[in-house]
Design a protein with these regions (language model features):
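Bacterial signal peptide processing site
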Residues: 24-27
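Extracytoplasmic
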Residues: 56, 64-67
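Bacterial N-terminal signal peptides that target proteins for export
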Residues: 1-12
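Surface-exposed short loop/turn segments
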Residues: 66-72, 76-118, 122-140, 147, ...
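Post-signal peptide N-terminal segment of mature Sec-exported envelope proteins
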Residues: 32-56
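Sec-exported extracytoplasmic/periplasmic mature domains
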Residues: 60, 64, 150, 154-162
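C-terminal motif of bacterial Sec signal peptides marking the signal peptidase cleavage site
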Residues: 18-22
Length: 164
């Protein structure tokens, strides 16, 4: 009897797989798509500090900004740190880092703002006894935070393009 129900499960799985294979899904960043063309026409404002540089590099991987740029993307990252996991002696054993990025995309030709907004992300890192380990963990946490913010900005840009 178990053999029969197992065959039904396999059959249903096969039918679902065939149905999905027949649909017309296409990659979002496919060369020549509207989204890819839009993203290739965005130039990034120059980074001003270490955090902006990490954010800039992550976005530069996705945005071409080479030929015929029509838009300028300006980003202002902000961050704050809070203690979490307080030890009995009052030392923080963990820090939570919250980041915000205000972004604005304008048309280069006329300076008209196309869209602006803000994104938020957070991450954390452990405090240890070693100052070197704390510095390394802190830098890694800030890098992860900027990458999260860049990914959220990219998502927002794709949604801008998708709107009629």
């Amino acid at each position: 009897m178990w053999w029969f129900s197992r065959n039904i499960l396999y059959s249903v799985s096969l039918l679902i797989g065939l149905a999905l294979a027949g649909c017309t899904l296409e990659p979002l960043y496919k060369s020549g798509s509207e989204t890819a063309d839009f993203l290739q026409n965005i130039k990034l404002d120059a980074p001003k500090d270490r955090d902006s540089y990490v954010l800039y590099n992550r976005l530069a991987e996705r945005l071409d900004g080479g030929h015929g740029t029509r838009y300028l993307l300006s980003i202002t990252p902000r961050k704050s740190e809070a203690r979490a996991g307080i030890a009995a002696d009052g030392r923080a054993q963990r820090k939570i880092v919250t980041g915000f990025a205000d972004y604005s995309i304008v048309q280069i030709a006329d300076g008209k703002e196309v869209q602006s907004g803000s994104v938020k992300a957070f991450t954390g890192y452990a405090q240890s006894a070693s100052n070197v380990a704390i510095l390394a963990a802190s830098n890694d946490a800030y890098d992860r935070l900027m990458i999260q913010l860049a990914d959220k900005i990219l998502d927002a840009l794709i949604l801008i393009q998708a709107q009629p």
